C-alpha cells in the first residue's frame, strides 16, 4: 500500500510539472510562428501560416484556458497583419475574441489565469481602443493597462509582458506615462529577461524602433543586427531597416 501511495503521489506531481511545461512549449511555439509570419514572403503565405496554426491549436490537447490564450494571441497577429485596409473585419475579429475572453473570465479574478492570456487579452483591448472614442476608448485603454500590469505583477520577468506593455506605452500620451522613452525602458526589460532566441529576437526588433523614434539610428541598427544574428536566414530585419530609412516604424 505504501508503494502504491508513493506512486500515486509521484504521478500527481508529475502531472503538475508536465502540464505547465506543455503549455509553456505551446507559447514558445507561438513565438516561432510569429517570427515565421513576419518573414512570410507574401499575403498568401501569411494566410496559409495563420490557417495552419489555427488548425494546430484546434487539434492540440491543451485545456480550455490554454487554447483561448493561443486563439487570442493569434487574433492579435491576424489583425495586425491585415492592416487598416481590413478595418471592419479586424474590428469584428477583435470584438468576437474580446467577448470570448469576457465569457471565460466571468466569475474569475485576473490573478487566477495565466500571464499569456492576460497579455493577449490586453493586446485585444488596446487595439479595440483604436476603434473607439471618448469614454469607451479611455475604458478599453485603461483596462488593457491593468491587464498588462497584472501580468507583470505575477511575473516581473515576463518578456512578452514587457514587450506588449512597451508597445502600449509607445502610443500612450505623456499624461498617461507614455512615449518613446517609456517604451524603450519596457523593451529593454524584454531584452534583458529573454530566455529564448525567439523572445530576444522580438524584443530587439521592437527596441530598435524605439531607438528610431528617439533618433538614435546607431543603436537601432545594432539591435537589428543582433536580431538577425539570432536567425541568419530571416529577412524581416532588412525590411524594417529599409522602412526606417524612409521614416517608417514597422509597428505603425
Please describe what each predicted stretch is:
Residues 8-18:
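Bacterial N-terminal signal peptides
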Residues 25-36, 61-85, 111-132, 157-173, ...:
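Amphipathic alpha-helical repeat scaffolds of TPR domains
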Residues 43-46, 87, 91, 141, ...:
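TPR-repeat structural position
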Residues 49, 90, 94-97, 144, ...:
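Single-residue signature of alpha-solenoid repeat helices
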Residues 53, 94, 98-101, 105, ...:
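Hydrophobic/aromatic packing residues within the alpha-helices of TPR/SEL1-like helical repeat arrays
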Residues 56, 104, 151, 190-193, ...:
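Canonical positions in the second alpha-helix
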Residues 61-65, 105, 159, 194-200, ...:
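Boundary/linker segments of alpha-helical solenoid repeat arrays
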Residues 201-203, 210-252:
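Terminal, low-structured helical/coil segments at or just beyond the last alpha-helical repeat
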Amino acid at each position: 500500500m505504501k508503494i502504491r501511495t508513493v506512486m500515486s503521489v509521484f504521478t500527481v506531481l508529475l502531472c503538475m510539472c508536465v502540464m505547465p511545461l506543455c503549455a509553456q512549449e505551446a507559447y514558445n511555439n507561438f513565438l516561432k510562428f510569429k517570427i515565421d509570419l513576419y518573414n512570410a514572403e507574401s499575403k498568401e503565405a501569411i494566410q496559409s501560416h495563420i490557417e495552419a496554426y489555427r488548425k494546430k491549436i484546434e487539434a492540440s490537447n491543451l485545456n480550455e484556458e490554454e487554447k483561448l490564450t493561443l486563439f487570442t494571441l493569434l487574433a492579435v497577429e491576424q489583425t495586425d497583419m491585415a492592416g487598416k485596409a481590413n478595418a471592419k473585419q479586424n474590428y469584428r475579429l477583435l470584438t468576437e475574441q474580446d467577448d470570448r475572453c469576457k465569457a471565460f473570465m466571468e466569475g474569475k479574478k485576473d490573478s487566477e489565469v495565466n500571464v499569456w492570456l492576460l497579455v493577449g487579452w490586453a493586446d485585444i483591448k488596446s487595439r479595440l481602443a483604436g476603434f473607439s472614442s471618448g469614454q469607451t476608448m479611455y475604458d478599453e485603454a485603461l483596462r488593457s493597462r491593468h491587464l498588462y500590469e497584472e501580468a507583470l505583477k505575477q511575473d516581473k520577468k515576463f518578456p512578452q509582458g514587457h514587450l506588449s506593455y512597451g508597445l502600449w506605452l509607445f502610443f500612450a500620451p505623456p499624461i498617461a506615462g507614455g512615449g518613446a522613452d517609456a517604451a524603450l525602458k519596457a523593451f529593454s526589460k524584454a531584452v534583458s529577461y529573454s530566455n529564448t532566441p525567439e523572445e530576444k529576437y522580438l524584443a530587439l526588433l521592437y527596441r530598435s524602433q524605439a531607438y528610431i523614434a528617439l533618433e538614435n539610428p546607431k543603436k537601432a541598427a545594432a539591435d537589428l543586427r543582433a536580431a538577425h544574428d539570432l536567425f541568419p536566414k530571416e529577412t524581416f530585419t532588412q525590411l524594417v531597416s529599409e522602412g526606417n530609412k524612409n521614416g517608417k516604424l514597422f509597428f505603425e
